[in-house]
Amino acid sequence: MPRPITAVIHRQALQNNLAVVRKAMPNSKVFAVVKANAYGHGIERVYEAFKAADGFALLDLEEAKRIRALGWTGPILLLEGVFSPQDLFDCVQYQLSFTIHSEAQIEWVEQHPYPAQFDVFLKMNSGMSRLGFKPQHYVQAWERLNNLANVAKITHMMHFSDADGDRFGQQGIDYQITAFEEIVKDLPGERSVSNSAAILRYQDQLKSDYVRSGIMLYGSSPDYPTHSIADWGLQPTMSLRSEIISVQHLEPNESVGYGSNFVAEQPMTIGIVACGYADGYQRISPTGTPVLVDSVRTRTVGRVSMDMLAVDLTGIESAKVGSEVVLWGQSSTGVVLPIDDVAVSSGTVGYELMCAVTARVQFINQV
């Protein structure tokens, strides 16, 4: 019998979350962002749910090829563009759109030796300062591309750094969208500005012909704890489940786990769960991180080890060897433990937890 830890992927929840995007931005085309192997869910596992999107956005060519191999004939956008001149040949072969964010990438397109009709997304660095042309250099970059016979379409693109909250005491999007609009207002072309946080928080304020929905598709709130997934109508798409494999009874002053950093203050019962940091659960998750045991919310106790962790069974009379444990997601009876609750307790974000689940965990698709 295999080790009992599984990651259940809920197709219905994926479809629900895509529908939330559509409802929020009914006049926009929707890119489903599936970078990092669909945020740890697996591109092949989410494809059926997301093929109702208008396109897929991802990072590298191998992921793009996997999408094409599944039968997708619609748009695919490389969010970081090409990494070498040779990649442009694959863009032609697989009909890929790509971001342009640097002088080098423009030069590669200018020097491409064969006829092509590239669909590019020109990125402005409107304030995040990772990729893109600063506003004062953006028009020059656009003009260079617009003069090329092998560039068929240019979409204006930017990425918000603070759409999930405030920036220096102002609404998080204000600084960047002002800089962006001032430059592109007189240039032809469609726009792609909204990420998950902007889709949900500023749907009535932003014009975005293409939206790039990422974390919201996977059942994590982009502005937690201000809003939960329930507030946005989102559903958890990944449930990391395991079982209790041992029950231990602690007396006062007895400890559990490496470092003895949890010591019982009174008699208590704990369960040992088949899940550890080698499965992708965070080693730094402290005592008190929420879990579900038999659909009842409780907490972890002690240090997470490679293959196991301990949970407090106080008040859970049904708990025994074989009891279901939900590390995040939803239980088999439908009780939800939001991944954001676990992430905050662990000092991280839901994105990291999803992406960290390792290959030794069995994935199960649930319709």
UniProtKB/Swiss-Prot annotation:
Any one cellular-component term (Gene Ontology): cytosol
Give the SUPFAM superfamilies listed for this entry: Alanine racemase C-terminal domain-like, PLP-binding barrel
Could you tell me which InterPro entries the record lists for this protein?
A: Ala_racemase, Ala_racemase/Decarboxylase_C, Ala_racemase_C, Ala_racemase_N, Ala_racemase_pyridoxalP-BS, PLP-binding_barrel
Which reaction does this chain catalyze? L-alanine = D-alanine
Q: Which UniProt keywords apply?
A: Isomerase, Pyridoxal phosphate
Q: Which Pfam families match?
A: Ala_racemase_C, Ala_racemase_N
Residues where substrate binds: 130, 306
Coiled-coil stretches are none
Q: Which cofactor does it need?
A: pyridoxal 5'-phosphate
Q: What is this enzyme's class at the first EC digit?
A: isomerase
Q: What are its GO biological-process terms?
A: D-alanine biosynthetic process
Annotated active site residues, numbered on this chain, are: 35 (proton acceptor), 258 (proton acceptor)
List every position bearing N6-(pyridoxal phosphate)lysine: 35
What family name appears in the similarity comment?
Answer: Belongs to the alanine racemase family.
What protein name applies here? Alanine racemase
Taxonomic lineage is:
Bacteria, Pseudomonadati, Pseudomonadota, Gammaproteobacteria, Moraxellales
